[in-house]
């Protein structure tokens, strides 16, 4: 009988990261997915990254994950979103060639040390004494294991809706999984339904681009991965069009036929990625909504019209599309649809992503209530790392709100749960100025090195980068000019007769890297590796970062203050019954987690801290 230490079920974005991370830690790992072409499948939009999401990708890369490197082998339209705003909200994004992305992912995974791939369907999991024993395939065969990572995406009792038509499926033309849903219910997990959707696909050869707006990418693509020196994939343009009043009229007239508005769908959809029906109803005063026409590949004429996700009947979809400028004669290749699926309340998992009910069972991705490739991949890498570390009897690996967006996401999910598809935003992070895309490796790679999940190649690149940062920082502190000379160059500084270094100049409003290079041409040599830009940001926002680091230190001290599992909140007399009930229900593990529970007052936190000092001052009962 086959036996593996870790088995990952599902080969989507969470699954591939989980399997690769486990394998990198030297643990024999099996990835089970339905077919080869499912590996890294982009079920919805053909793009990676975006605002906050791009930072997640960079963090995955910092831990030697796959997503950043793979998109650099397949990215056909790179764009830094929000670049006119502050660096805390910059969002690296790349349009992908679907075929190139899957090809690169397949080539990497099929040659990955310690990783085997099995193409098949898991029907059930075997548990004994609340511990994982094996997976059972639909052909009845059994594979023994110590740990299982479930990354089921939209396959748990998946149901596609197109108008009034219902199609049981986890994805178009792929069967859903009822067996695993039933098993999870039998175990006692709390399951609910969520919904997501996708737009129709259209034929780019039938679009009149003269009626659309050109959207070029960045002149020089900035890679996601620290392993990528330069993006060698050909770059192409995207285009923008918009809905019209006629589009809106057709949608309003047919709302009763929409699966969402007819009451046919039970699941809640993503608040921040609404269907076109939702947009028309919720934003009824808007006369138009933008649509991004995104090519699905270099040699693929399929276009993804980002912005018109729908569950309307096919004939209505055809009508509304033809009211959009440039799409009057367009050919629809595949209808849009909504898909409903089961997920588990993420408060049933710990911050390691191991379930609280079953030892050795981990969840990652949409099963935890998230939406998005990047959110799934971020969970996958953490689940894979922790499953492998548990096999090796090593301490778990936990990221926090203070050091990563991945940590913010996991803390949000495990503390508050979610009743709608969870998506990452910069606004979810209290420390977003410190948690930028450009410093992801400086925050996380050393942590990955400490547990052995980072390859030797990446270690060398990271070590060299750290050395270069110190060298360039020293240079920036050495190069200087007097205030009088700077004034003659038109740079406004206080005329105090002192010398100003480049780092001093970076703090001046409106002074930028390009100006520094003009004044000190030798800096041009440092520009290629983005270190100069990094140091510019650190200098520009130094005072804010100093204050934020103080906040982070306070946060970390509260996170380190554990709350005993057996604490009885009803014995703390100075807090209200409502708060006592809330704390008893949530069972926070630290003071930091307790503080983040909605409705918990600062006075209640103070009361808990005082109670812990008096009741548990001898260190008993943790």
Swiss-Prot record:
The gene is mnmG. Belongs to the MnmG family. GO terms for molecular function: flavin adenine dinucleotide binding. Its main location: cytoplasm. It is found in: Cytoplasm. Homodimer. Heterotetramer of two MnmE and two MnmG subunits. It holds the Pfam family GIDA. FAD binds at residues 10-15, 122, 177, 366. Its cofactor is FAD. Coiled coil: none annotated. NAD-binding protein involved in the addition of a carboxymethylaminomethyl (cmnm) group at the wobble position (U34) of certain tRNAs, forming tRNA-cmnm(5)s(2)U34. This is tRNA uridine 5-carboxymethylaminomethyl modification enzyme MnmG. GO terms for cellular component: cytosol. One of its GO terms (biological process) is tRNA wobble uridine modification. InterPro entries: FAD/NAD-bd_sf, GIDA_C_N, MnmG, MnmG-rel, MnmG-rel_CS, MnmG_C, MnmG_C_subdom, MnmG_C_subdom_sf. It comes from Rickettsia massiliae (strain Mtu5). Keywords: Cytoplasm, FAD, Flavoprotein, NAD, tRNA processing. Signal peptide: none annotated. NAD(+) binds at residues 269-283.
